[in-house]
Amino acid sequence: MKAFTTTLVRFFTCLPALVLGMAILRLVELGTHASDLKALLIPALINDLLALVRYLPFVFLLSLPGLAMRNRLARLAWIGVTWSMLLAVQGALIAYQRAAGALLGADLFGYSWKEIQLILAGHANTDFLMAASMAIVIAVMLSVLVRKDRIEKPGWKPPYAIAALALSVVAFFLLPNQMESDDGGRQDLAIVTVNKAAFFAHANLEYLVRWAPSKPAAGTGDAAYPFVHAETTPDTLGPLFNTQPTPPNLVLIIVEGLGRSFSGPGARQGSFTPFLDELAGQSLYWENFVAPQGRTFGVLPSLLGSLPFGEHGFSSMGKNMPAHASLVSILHSQGYRTRYFTGTSLEFDNQGEFMKRQGTDVISGSAQFDPSVQRGNEWGYADRELFDHQLKFAGNDSCQPCLTVIQTVTMHDPFTFPGQEEYKARVTQRLDQLNIAADKRALYRDDARIFASILYTDDALRHYFAEARKQPGHDNTIYIITGDHRLPELPMSHRLERYHVPLIVYSPLLKEPQRIRSMSSQFDVTPSLLAFLSHQYGLKTPAQASWLGSGLDMEPGFRNVHAFPLKQTKTDLHDYISGNVMLSQGRLYSIADGMEIDPSDNQDARKKASAQFSAFKAINAALERSKKLVPASVLEQPSLGYDGNQRKLQTAALAADLGNLWVSKAKAEVVEDELRISAQFANRGDAGSPAFVPLLVVTDANGRELGESYGKATKLASNAGVDVDLRMKLKLPAGTYFASVIVSHPDTGKPIGQGQYHIPFTR
């Protein structure tokens, strides 16, 4: 016992050396956010204190062999190397977060060694600040360690040291890993305050000791196939298209990293996709569209198959992928020629294996490019080269009808491509076009390579469509463009922004363009396309399906009739959307137009969403174990014709919705120093509405509230409406701001209807 207490006292005597090293690293990290230091300092210190208290026993165990050594040189060598490694890990995790804009958790469990090497190569840019800081920090730590080890009469008495260690063991189980904090609309700052080593350790421990979910609930009464249900997807697209004698060609373009915060109308950071914006004005454009995955691993299964995730993503099951139906396999079986093109390796995320399982006729990755073509970076070929490669192939492979999938890669770290310097110069030109104030441009300068890659990909798309219009069959083609996820390297306001991507459906067959504010997800694309082709062209679809989606919602106003999971990384399944609420890492948020979220205390909705999410996780885990998704009989031959009487868009009970009160046709106008808003409020219910107050809220580009104004309390009869004018005096500097028109409760001010949000205006 005496030997143990001696080593324990020695540990606490030397511990200030490690704490000092960690503190210096934290100060270096916070120093790169000097303008926000006041908001960051206290939460960061609390998180670091939590990390120290909770993980103290683990540090002690790692140090114990060295602490027990009698030879001073050997003891110092063991402790010095061990603690240097801890500091190096913390520094590397900080550097990763600075480069990737995201925290590193248990992600690496979801990738092969070959994929990890490719990921690391993509993040090869050296963070010289952190590299230099780590060298200095380790030197300081070793210097203090040597001095502390010389102390012959340590200040720690054995009972105090034992008590401190015992309390830290208890703290590990009782205290939270990180402080819960309101990010104030700046998720990018919130993750700065997180202790990176504690987050990494917690995520990996949680992954390794995760409990098996509860018993799954069957969807059809067949416990072996709980995802199977009757195919009831309605044809929401059909009324919007002119039909032709032959089925249309389909081209799906998956743009790496394309997010709504920098693309499309009202983009929070300004739109850097002028061509896509122009195309959106000629298309069906979903403003509140969701990618169910936060990384590329899930986009092909989600978009092309409306498939569940399994443990690490559906395609990660490789040759053990359960038998399943998809857009590709169903169309392939009915005469479509199917093709897939990407500029990167087909091995990454098992993309090639997934497309092979669909029976895809042509699968082309980086290995299929002409060797004379210049590679963009470690990931593969730049988007212009990818589109040229596909166009050249298509010119020699005419087919009617065709399904073509093109997946880009340029908008991915390290964001390098031919002609990069020219596009960096164009970033400044774009800032001028967007009227971004001079004092707001630091962010854009710091991330010029990212914004340059966005402009480059937008130009590559412009080039592709200019050439595609010359191709045979263009007039009978439907083009679908979306992002695989929102790139994380640019600052995000909140967790949902990672999943917020545009959906553009463009076609010469389209009767007229529309902007759609209702929510849908990539899970809804395949069911909708198959319902459209079945209803309009007589193609057959399976009578039973395993789709997670129920079809694209065409409602012009904001609403969500869907419920679905979100998986940010291969090992992170913590988010779920049901109606107008999002359950994220155990916390509930309400979702508003523009995909803005606010914390919600709706306990009934929280209970329902938690139950739905738990049920999904249970059957998702069962899928991973059994490798069974649908019976063979469902896949043998598509047989279901379209019957509109059996179709419905909403198939799940929602945790919460915003009822029957709606705001529409809101318009903003600034006259002198006054903001004037006109809007229509309507009751779409079969009964009279409760009392409500029209509420106007003005925010800046970061979502910070700047003021509000109220109208008169009102009630509406069934199916009645009223025009409302709201006004507010403005005491704001010149710039771009946003107005939200909300159906609010007379007493609490909380939303009780479908508002209209994020309406831009210029002061």
Task: Describe the residue ranges of each PLM region.
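A short beta-turn/strand-edge loop motif at beta-sheet boundaries
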Residues: R684-A691
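Short, surface-exposed loop/turn segments at beta-strand-coil junctions that are enriched for proline
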Residues: K729-P733
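Solvent-exposed serine/threonine-rich low-complexity stretches and specific carbohydrate-binding patches
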Residues: L706-A717, Y757-H758
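Aromatic sugar-binding surface patches on proteins
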Residues: S718-L726
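Phosphate/adenylate-binding glycine loop and adjacent helical scaffold
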Residues: T541-G659
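Soluble catalytic regions of membrane-associated enzymes that act on cell-envelope
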Residues: V192-T541, G549, P556-R559
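Short beta-strand elements
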Residues: K750-R763
